[in-house]
Amino acid sequence: MPRHGRQRLGGRLLQCGVPFIGASARIAPGVGRPLESQVSAPGGTGTCHRSQRVSAMVGSMAQGVETGIMREPVLRAWMQDSVPPTTHYHERPGRWVGESSWPPKNMRERTYTPEWPGVLNADAVSVERRIMTVQSPLSAGLFAGKWCSYAATPDLPHDQREEDDGALVFTSPPLSNPLEIFGAPTVALNLSANRPVAMVAIRLSDVQPDDQAARVTYGLLNLTHREGSAHPSPLTPGQQYRVKLTLNHIAQRFPAGHRLRLSISTSHWPLAWPPPEPAQLAIETGTSRLVLPKRNARSSDAHIAFAPAEGAPVCTKEQLTTPHHNWRVIRDLAADTSTLEVINDDGTVRFPDLDLDLQRRALEWYSYQGMDFCSARGETLWERGFRRGDWSVRTVTCTLLTSTPTHFQLHAQLDAFEGERRVYAETWNEDIARDLV
């Protein structure tokens, strides 16, 4: 079943009270909220214990075999330790934590209030209401990394100071004690906009003593969907709204001496397509809130352990051409254009047991010019090919997405080759109404 289908099914089972097991190496942000709360793991697919957990559950529930899994925590997750920001990690230090229910019964909320002139204050009782405005450049988001990292590094978010120049930033004093959060932080904002279509991007970062800022979690909202996606409606410019965002679930430890940072921006390109025109948000400080799901460390967490991961034998393969993975930000100061180039080239791999060569390459470009929000442009080139002896086949797909104030413009081309002869080709050109996007 496709990933999103599995998550929708898991969410329905949770709502009906049906027992099920969810096991995953990663959580795709923003999808399958009920199921997302139930599973998490620290590494890529190569380090996950999914098969062993599923086997133990099936043995216990379907076959009546005593596997011990029913005495284990209902939920286990990897509580990440603080690390300096970088676009790739060899490992993420931390520890396993477990809960007997979700949401956990002993979870406590810790509330922070954004205050003038940029302070994030814990448990504020009475503070002055002030209006602070933000209108972000399209560069806000260039260093955000991939929507869902697939370990094709360097695709993780970089030092968030690169992003904070285009954001409204609130930073807490240094923590006097370590803080652990587990779950989905929420943000409630009193805001108004000067345009009928606008978006807000919110990031929570771990600010280290040397001022490096590592993104912990984030959330995006098209403000025309402020009351849900079933019936979006334009904003009334100048009218204040109470808007709530749920950030992506996370398990994170903030050491003493570190600071929390809440960053608010009005664009997050290219993770989110920008609105039709630049919009300014007016945020009311003193009444807006950041609520963190605070979890106290427990000695029982030390007893959570897994056997070494098991898997099928690795197939024999030979790397015929060198793979190349990179992300590059290119600034053309003369033309005032910025481009994010993503290179995901796996090269050519040979599988001797099958006498088969496999070639995979994906290139992506995301660009814009100045503050022209309708200059945003996303382009992809994907190639896939197989070769055995004198026989070879490959496909090439090119996709280009641009926009006007009223429509998205999609241009796509598919070519299929057998040897050097093109055996199939198709082209698409479509205009799609933006519909408050």
Task: Outline where the language-model segments fall.
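Short alpha-helix in the alpha/beta-hydrolase fold that links the catalytic acid
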Residues: 13-27
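C-terminal, loop-rich substrate-recognition/catalytic regions characterized by aromatic stacking residues
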Residues: 48-437
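Active-site-proximal cap/lid insertion segments
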Residues: 37-42, 50, 54
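Catalytic histidine neighborhood in serine/cysteine hydrolases
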Residues: 26-41
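Short beta-strand/loop motif that positions the catalytic acidic residue
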Residues: 2-5
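Alpha-helix capping and helix-loop boundary segments enriched in small/acidic/polar residues
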Residues: 8, 12, 42-48
